[in-house]
Amino acid sequence: MFSPQIEWDCSQCQSGPTDRRKYCTNCHSMLSWTCTGAGKSGLHTHYYRHRDSCSYCTPELEEERQQKIEEKEVALQQHFQALNDEQRPWSEWKRTDASCIQHTGHDVEQIQELYSMCEEALINYCSHKNYRHTNSAATSYLSPMNLLVVTLWHLKHYHSERYIASELDLSQSAVNYFLSAVVDILHSCVYPELMSFPAGMDNRRILHGPEEHHKLIVGSTFITIPQPDNLDQRKAYYHAKSSTNYTLKVQIACDFRHRIIHVSECYHESVHDITVLRESGLLEHVNDSVQIIADKGCIGEEYVVIPRKKPHGRELTDEDNDFNRDINSARAAIENINQRLKTYAILGGVYRGAVEDFHKVAKSFRSFVLSVI
C-alpha cells in the first residue's frame, strides 16, 4: 500500500516513475520517496519502515500508535517508580528526614518537590541514554530519583567521583557523565522555577528594606580555585582572603524574604562588582519604585543604593550614620546567605573542576544554590 502523501522519483536519471517498482525502469537505480506531509525522504528499501510510523501515510493507524506510545510511557514510569523505591541510596535516605538532610541538605518532602520539577527530563535521560557502565551486575544503572539525590549529595559534600563510584558500584566515567547531565537538568528545569523576581515588586505591600522602594539586595561571593599556572591568570584570579589566594567571583541577589532570586555568571576576581551587576540584567528591572541595595563597590548607578562615604576632611552626619546603619542591616540578609553557602563543602573547599569554562562553573554553582534554598 502506497500513500498519496508519497512522491517517487529516480535520483540518478531524474525520471518520474509511473509504477511502484523498487528500481527505475530506465537506469535500474533504486527509487527514492519523499513524504510531503512529514517532509522526510529516503530510498525504497526504507519506505515501509517510514510508512508504519508516519501519521501522514497511515492516519488510520495513528490512534493505535498513540495508544502504544502511552502504554509504553506508563510502563516506563511504573518501572522507574519501582526502581526509585527499591534502589539505594534513596531507599535508605528516604526513611527519615534526618538522614535525607544529612546527605542532601533537603528533607524528604523537599526532595520530592525538586523531583517533580525535573521528573520528565530525568526519565527521558534514563530512557534514551545508555549510561549503564558498572563494576558488577548488581546495579545496572541509577533510577531517576537516585540520579537526583546522588547529584545533590555530591553538591552538598563535594565527594570525589571516584568515591561516589565506589559507594554505588558504578564506573567513574558513568558518575562523571551523569553528574554533568543532572546538573544541566537542574539548571534547565528547576533554576527557572525557583529563581524569579517577586511578582509586583513595585507594590508598596511587598516586603522591602529601610525604605519602601528598597526591594533587592546584591552581594558577591567567591569560589576558591587552585593556583593557576599562568602568571596572567594568577593576576586575574587573585583574591587575598581565600585559602589558595585565587577565586572566581559570583554575584547573588535576594529579596527581603531572604529568597535568592538571581545568580550571575562567573567572573575573574579582578572584574569590578559594578561590572558584574551591569552585565547581570538586574538593572533592567530597577526604577523609582524598585531599587537595589549593594555595597560600596557598586557605585555609579542611579537606582543602586550604597552606604554613604565620609566626605573628605569631614565626618558623616547623624543622618548619614543612621542611613548607613539601616543599609548595612539590610545587607546582612545577603551576607547571611553567603555564609550559609560557605558551610557546604563545594564552596567551603577548593573547586576541582575546569575553571576556564565559566558558564559550566556557573551552572554547577547555580545547581548547588538550588540545594540550599
What residue spans do the PLM features occupy?
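Short helix-to-turn junction characteristic of helix-turn-helix DNA-binding domains
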Residues: 153-154
